[in-house]
Amino acid sequence: MQGDVYDKDKQTVCPECGSTELIGDYERAEVVCAHCGLVIDENLVDMGPEWRAFDHEQRDKRTRVGAPITYTIHDKGLSTMIDWRNKDIYGRDIPARNRAQWYRLRKWQRKIRISGATERNLAFALSELDRDSSRLGLPRSVREAASVVYRSAVDNKLIRGRSIEGVVAASLYAACRRCNVPRTLDEIAEVSRVTKKEVGRTYRFLTRELNIKLPPTSPVDYVPRFASELGLSGEAQSRAIEIIEKAMEKGLTSGRGPTGVAAAALYIASVLLGERKTQRDVADIAGVTEVTIRNRYKELTEQLEMGVTL
């Protein structure tokens, strides 16, 4: 039976067995106990739309609500736009005598959407954020989180005296750490047209002023992405994570860059499993030097007594 969990106030417990798991079957207008099957109510009112749909395609066509609210657009996606195709609601062409009027309306409507200084700032910054996110291959959840951080910075008047690009980059870096989608400062700076130093300085400023608490980045967070880009197997990825966890237990990762530790662990795992990759390949993917790979490799193999040779 298709239905939803019934949560109305008038009946929350089955009078027969005492179960609180009640199912609302809107097709039959019944409320049924999921435990014993007792029909509790036969006059359930369907609060859904008045139209009917017999498959998903019809449902999509007849749904009249808009897109969900998103923080990645300056107006949160709540405003409307006049279509540029010069067609009315029924798909018919707009008469030629009215097209000049539609052009003027469209022009004014665009101006009205972005009228104030704050809206212009958000429109530019969020488009920049979307561009940087696309180049970094970040998921939508990270973009939403970064947009929230940037909006908080605007609301708290933290933008003045700083470049929009720098604040956007710092917001992205904070969102990546919050969502456990790690990206290095070098990667953020490369796509954001600001220096690594500025990104780091602005990031520290935002986290301090907005009281954002973020856990330190773990080398484990970088392993899946590096392993995928290197074409290593899932077994190699698991082995690298085991190596990192043992190293963390012994305190070998303290004061070490997480990308360097992750890269060295993956290199060791590739050697152990016969999926050998060159140090240059691993270093290029991780954004570290070959010297860093060799140093971390030596520390891990000696301290963990792994007995692996280059």
From Swiss-Prot:
GO molecular function annotations of the record: DNA-binding transcription factor activity; TBP-class protein binding; zinc ion binding
GO cellular component, one term: transcription preinitiation complex
Keyword flag Metal-binding: yes
UniProt keyword annotations, A-Z: Metal-binding, Repeat, Transcription, Transcription regulation, Zinc, Zinc-finger
Domain of life: Archaea
One Pfam family it belongs to: Zn_Ribbon_TF
Record: residues binding Zn(2+): 14, 17, 33, 36
Gene3D superfamilies referenced in this protein's UniProt entry, alphabetically: 1.10.472.170, Cyclin-like (1.10.472.10)
Gene Ontology biological-process entries: transcription preinitiation complex assembly
UniProt key word Transcription regulation: yes
Chain ranges of zinc fingers (TFIIB-type): 9-41
Chain positions of Sequence repeats: 127-210, 221-302
PANTHER family per the UniProt record, alphabetical: TRANSCRIPTION INITIATION FACTOR IIB, TRANSCRIPTION INITIATION FACTOR IIB-RELATED
General function of this protein: Stabilizes TBP binding to an archaeal box-A promoter. Also responsible for recruiting RNA polymerase II to the pre-initiation complex (DNA-TBP-TFIIB).
Family: Belongs to the TFIIB family.
Protein name: Transcription initiation factor IIB
Organism: Methanobrevibacter smithii (strain ATCC 35061 / DSM 861 / OCM 144 / PS)
